[in-house]
């Protein structure tokens, strides 16, 4: 938007008015951790948090030091590859929120050398970013512990793959909600550049209204997405992944 504003002298995506961007659905960034691993971490650290995960990442004694089994090896963190999935960046921002104890995180916070050193220790528990796929929740379902012990992923991805995880592996995946939550709101925005007519803009608005309609918002529940329409609760349908 900034580059177009510089060239055209106006915004092409609006933040207010009839054509402003609006969320279509919402998915929170949550912890997904195998139950056996989560129980060991909670027994040792009392909670699942970025601080706990950092301490687990730097534990030189591996899982025995964390209250787990020696056969588990070292703690393995799972976050999406930031080069393939914006969720990887969201995870790092969420970690920064907890590190600083606030929600207003700026560039200067992320580039702070002390935070960078802490983050490097934390991300050292990721087995291999270069081979990490964009859809790590699906990898949990397919490959189990070889992917990792747990990590922060989109709630919708975890819910969509939960049945596969329960079917293939004896150890269920538990979902935990962090103190500092980041989320994706999947915005629908109307392009208001000079090449779009009023008829085209209004057609886009009509499609937006269709997506926010009760029936479509209820359909989103079967994909583990939270409705943006406040009149549709997460347990509105039998097919909702929030009630399965």
Could you tell me what each predicted segment is?
Residues 1, 30-33, 75-79, 87, ...:
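Structural recognition of the beta-strand scaffold that forms the well-ordered cores
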Residues 1-73, 81-84:
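N-terminal segment of the mature folded domain
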Residues 1-4, 27, 49-53, 87-91, ...:
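Stable alpha-helical elements in mature extracytoplasmic
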Residues 5-9, 33-37, 58, 95-104, ...:
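Sec-exported extracytoplasmic/periplasmic mature domains
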Residues 17-31, 116-126, 130-133, 167-196, ...:
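Periplasmic-binding protein-like
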Residues 36-43, 84, 97-106, 194-204:
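Short helix-loop capping/hinge motifs at secondary-structure junctions, enriched
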Residues 91-176:
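Ligand-binding pocket segment of bilobal, Venus flytrap-like solute-binding proteins
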Residues 189-244:
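Extracellular/periplasmic juxtamembrane helices and adjacent flexible linkers that interface
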């Amino acid at each position: 938007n900034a580059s177009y504003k510089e060239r055209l002298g106006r915004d092409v995506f609006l933040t207010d008015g009839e054509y402003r961007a609006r969320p279509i659905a919402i998915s929170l960034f949550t912890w997904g951790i195998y139950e056996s691993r989560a129980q060991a971490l909670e027994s040792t650290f009392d909670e699942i948090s970025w601080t706990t995960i950092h301490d687990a990442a730097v534990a030189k004694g591996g899982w025995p030091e964390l209250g787990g089994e020696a056969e588990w090896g070292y703690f393995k963190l799972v976050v999406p590859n930031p080069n393939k999935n914006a969720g990887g960046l969201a995870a790092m921002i969420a970690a920064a929120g907890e590190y600083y104890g606030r929600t207003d995180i700026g560039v200067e916070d992320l580039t702070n050398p002390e935070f960078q050193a802490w983050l490097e220790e934390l991300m050292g528990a990721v087995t291999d970013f270069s081979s990490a796929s964009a859809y790590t929740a699906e990898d949990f379902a397919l490959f189990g512990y070889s992917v990792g012990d747990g990590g922060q992923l989109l709630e919708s991805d975890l819910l969509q793959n939960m049945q596969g995880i329960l079917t293939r592996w004896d150890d269920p995946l538990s979902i935990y909600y962090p103190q500092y939550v980041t989320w994706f709101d999947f915005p629908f925005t109307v392009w208001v550049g000079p090449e779009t007519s009023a008829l085209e803009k209004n057609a886009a608005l009509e499609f937006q209204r269709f997506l926010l309609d009760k029936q479509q918002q209820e359909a989103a529940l079967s994909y583990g997405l939270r409705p943006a329409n406040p009149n549709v609760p997460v347990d509105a349908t039998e097919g909702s992944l929030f009630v399965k």
